[in-house]
């Protein structure tokens, strides 16, 4: 009977302490302006900022200059057709390459289209003609616009020349001669081939993880600075158990970031008409372990923060690296095994891959089972590591308190 009563008391005390820690952590968040910036300002403003920057999706009227050494009807027709495309604007026809290079250096144009003097002659002789394209590769979207426009025009003029050189008796035969194998290009999931639809969903997921790491790390560093023994755990009877600390603190972050997730993953894509074909219920179930894994990872890393500035010095630069190794901006098959392994230490890697497949391509949880299981494994592993960190901090605080008590007792005895 006593044992049962004791167990009930321990459970009741644990629940009360958990909610005390939850309220205390909530106060710490709202009292710290730096943490408020990471928890609210950054996740609410950054998604809008990136979405506004890439809202045009594709580049239109990319500036190009032409060097036409051929000066023939065919070269002028080629230039006219390129200029007529939506993505490219021919701003000047230069006398030579030096003049064209100077315009590129002055950023008056970002590409050069060069026609050699034998361009028209080779075509009339039945030989292959060459058109050279030079691009400023500091802006890949300009390169994409120039390449697509010139390729389409080359194919179109090639069809016209085949029709002229091989006259057919009927219209149907002429169509077969011009285009023997007709094809239709269909852009799946990203119908505009836009940059925002491709990149912004990955950034939205990454922002959640990075702001949690920075915010929780700052809270941990602040707690150490304020603590007499430079410990992560305050000296209080309410902070006398590992699970109650981990559950209490994580409950605070979960409740705060539910709002952040709704804003970043549902409202922002809706505002900017980004692809959203996944089922909301599926998205919610997938984001849940991602949120758990990110929180417990952040709590684990906060144990190594010695000051409130430490997270900014250590983790801010990792955002670009994590975006690259997530497999979005660069195919994951081409990423070296070492960096691929590093990527899977962070929830952002499976989180980005799974979220894009669900939200943009309409995948189900079964189709992202690998990423989903990985996130739950990460959540479990980082929960254990965060418990170990806080257990170590509790034991360390106890030892330091006992050591301080013995020292003070010895000092008192010596004064007597």
Stretches found by the model and what they are:
Residues 1-197, 392, 398-416:
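Extracytoplasmic/periplasmic domains immediately adjacent to an N-terminal transmembrane anchor
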Residues 15, 19-23, 197, 238-251, ...:
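Alpha-helical membrane-protein architecture signal
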Residues 49-50, 71, 92, 255, ...:
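Membrane-spanning alpha-helical segments of multipass transporters and channels
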Residues 45-48, 186-268:
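Hydrophobic alpha-helical transmembrane segments of multi-pass membrane transport proteins
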Residues 29-36, 207, 248-254, 258, ...:
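Loop-to-transmembrane-helix entry motif
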Residues 30, 239, 304-305:
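Helix-loop interface residues and adjacent transmembrane-helix termini in multi-pass membrane transporters
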Residues 38-39, 201, 247-248, 311-314, ...:
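Hydrophobic core positions of alpha-helical segments in small-molecule transporters
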């Amino acid at each position: 009977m006593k044992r049962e009563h004791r167990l009930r008391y321990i459970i009741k005390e644990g629940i009360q302490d958990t909610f005390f820690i939850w309220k205390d952590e909530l106060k710490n968040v709202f009292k710290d302006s730096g943490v408020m910036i990471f928890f609210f300002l950054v996740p609410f403003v950054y998604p809008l900022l990136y979405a506004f920057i890439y809202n045009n999706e594709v580049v239109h009227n990319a500036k190009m200059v032409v060097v036409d050494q051929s000066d023939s009807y065919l070269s002028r027709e080629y230039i006219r057709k390129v200029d007529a495309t939506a993505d490219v604007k021919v701003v000047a026809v230069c006398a030579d390459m030096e003049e064209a290079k100077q315009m590129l250096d002055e950023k008056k144009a970002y590409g050069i289209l060069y026609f050699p003097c034998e361009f028209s002659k080779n075509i009339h002789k039945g030989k292959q003609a060459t058109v050279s394209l030079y691009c400023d590769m500091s802006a890949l979207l300009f390169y994409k616009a120039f390449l697509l426009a010139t390729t389409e025009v080359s194919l179109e003029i090639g069809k016209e020349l085949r029709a002229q050189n091989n006259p057919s008796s009927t219209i149907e035969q002429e169509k077969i001669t011009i285009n023997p194998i007709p094809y239709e290009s269909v852009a799946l999931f990203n119908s505009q081939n836009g940059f925002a639809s491709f990149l912004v969903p990955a950034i939205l997921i990454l922002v959640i993880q990075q702001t949690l790491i920075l915010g929780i790390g700052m809270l941990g560093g602040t707690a150490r600075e304020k603590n007499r023994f430079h410990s992560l755990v305050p000296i209080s009877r309410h902070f006398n158990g590992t699970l109650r600390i981990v559950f209490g603190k994580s409950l605070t972050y979960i409740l705060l970031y539910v709002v952040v997730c709704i804003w970043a993953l549902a409202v922002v894509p809706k505002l900017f008409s980004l692809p959203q074909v996944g089922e909301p219920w599926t998205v919610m179930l997938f984001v849940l372990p991602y949120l758990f894994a990110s929180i417990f990872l952040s709590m684990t890393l906060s144990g190594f923060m010695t000051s409130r500035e430490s997270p900014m010095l250590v983790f801010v630069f990792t955002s670009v690296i994590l975006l690259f190794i997530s497999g979005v901006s660069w195919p994951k098959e081409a990423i070296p095994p070492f960096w691929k392994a590093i990527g899977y230490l962070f929830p952002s890697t499976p989180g980005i891959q799974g979220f894009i497949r669900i939200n943009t391509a309409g995948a189900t949880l079964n189709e992202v089972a690998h990423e989903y299981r990985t996130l739950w494994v990460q959540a479990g592993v980082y929960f254990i590591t965060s418990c170990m960190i806080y257990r170590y901090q509790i034991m360390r605080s106890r030892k330091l308190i006992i050591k301080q008590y013995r020292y003070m007792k010895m000092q008192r005895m010596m004064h007597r």
